[in-house]
Amino acid sequence: MANADFMHRWFEEVWNKKSEAAIDEMLAPGAIGHGLQDPDGGDKIIGPESFKRLHRQFVAAYPDIHIEVLDTFVDGDKVGARCRVTGTHTGDALGMAPTNGRVDFTGMLVVRLDNERIVEAWNQFDFMTMYSQLGVLSLNV
């Protein structure tokens, strides 16, 4: 049975404390991450090293990134979290020069756990709002 505390720990250790050791501990070898792309190519994240490449780019772009878990749910071996992401885009990463813009957007992560490690993840974050807040995407249609 999965545990909602896992999600709080994932976001606190991996994102708020920026711990790569936590990535190695909490993400299984061969874990598949849907909804995110490996910066080195590929339409998904596969394994800890692939995730670390993306994590490093995000942390470089948003050194003060903070993710707050708003809600969690558990369904068998799956745990989900609705989150709020805040930060300041001060780093040159993710394909754009720093804008010094603040972002505040939400998203959801659902993970499947095996032996207290993520083996599969589904990411649904509102990156359109993030890009709009940075002024690089207009949502006026």
Predicted region positions:
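C-terminal and inter-domain tail/linker signature
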Residues: 1-141
